């Protein structure tokens, strides 16, 4: 059967299970054609829902979060009709920087080997990830970049450095050509901290800079909202058990923090967390009702 269908995903296995005469059909069976036409009526002879031009995405930073987002965007790349990773902005650490970045993307101690191909095009300062050319842009700050120089048009910039958290600083991405900025850390000031499924309804098309909050905030806010909606929270304490981070020492040594000098792989380290403030931004009704701290643990 030859059908004109729009871009979509079709589960052939599900169709086979639903077909009441699957074991008896032959190729080009009229009954089969009728069955398929009936099941796929919503996508036959319809225009595609996909936009004509994909939104360009730029990762500003290529640490843990940046590399995992790059994996997610390119591992099952498809035609890239909605979003397309076009650039990664980092500070150059060495002459062979691009090869080391490629290695870190390919191999991850927690998430394993990248399910795809990563090729270095050193001459063009490009990583070709699953066939997607991604420009490696070396810059010290957002002000040093003009995305149009690289053929990147009105990109959505995902700032995963955590260095800039205020609107006046993150606005530098807009001046560099970004259409929107998503911060992967709790924001300061009036920037909206969004926990998807909880308060994303406050977003509007005019928002240029938003925060996706933090891992802790995304983990605890849905639970707190459920409890507060059902029973009403009068007060509480957030104790987050967190993987140790790059800010800690591998072995006991001096650290500006009170406890972070202890060897990370061998100790549970109590420290502060910004999750309480971030929770209050997502759930304003809990402001002033919570305290919190974090325990960095070996993982």
Give a label for each model feature.
Residues 230-235, 239-243, 247-299:
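C-terminal substrate-binding/catalytic lobe of Rossmann-fold NAD(P)-dependent dehydrogenases
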Residues 1-249:
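N-terminal Rossmann-like NAD(P) cofactor-binding subdomain of oxidoreductases
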């Amino acid at each position: 059967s030859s059908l004109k269908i729009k871009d979509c995903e079709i589960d052939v296995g599900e169709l086979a299970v639903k077909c009441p005469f699957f074991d008896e059909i032959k190729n080009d069976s009229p009954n089969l054609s009728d069955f398929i036409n009936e099941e796929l009526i919503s996508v036959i002879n319809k225009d595609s829902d996909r936009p004509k031009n994909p939104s360009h995405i730029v990762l500003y930073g290529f640490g843990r979060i940046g590399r995992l987002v790059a994996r997610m965007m390119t591992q099952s790349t498809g035609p890239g009709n909605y979003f397309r990773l076009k650039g990664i902005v980092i500070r150059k650490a060495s002459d062979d920087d691009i090869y080391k970045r490629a290695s870190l993307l390919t191999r991850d101690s927690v998430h394993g080997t990248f399910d795809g191909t990563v090729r270095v095009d050193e001459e063009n300062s490009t990583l070709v990830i699953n066939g997607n050319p991604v420009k490696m842009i070396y810059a010290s700050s957002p002000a040093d970049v003009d995305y149009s120089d690289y053929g990147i048009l009105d990109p959505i910039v995902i700032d995963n450095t955590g260095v800039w958290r205020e609107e006046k600083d993150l606005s530098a991405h807009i001046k560099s050509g970004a259409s929107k900025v998503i911060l992967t850390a709790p924001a300061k000031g009036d920037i909206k901290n969004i926990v998807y499924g909880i308060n994303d309804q406050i977003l509007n098309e005019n928002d240029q800079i938003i925060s996706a909050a933090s891992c802790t905030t995304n983990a605890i806010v849905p639970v707190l909202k459920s409890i507060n909606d059902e029973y009403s929270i009068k007060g509480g304490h957030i104790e987050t058990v967190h993987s140790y981070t790059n800010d800690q020492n591998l072995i006991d040594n001096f650290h500006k923090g009170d406890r972070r000098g202890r060897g990370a792989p061998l100790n549970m380290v109590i420290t502060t967390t910004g999750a309480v403030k971030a929770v209050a931004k997502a759930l304003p009704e809990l402001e002033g009702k919570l305290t919190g701290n974090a325990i960095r643990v070996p993982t």
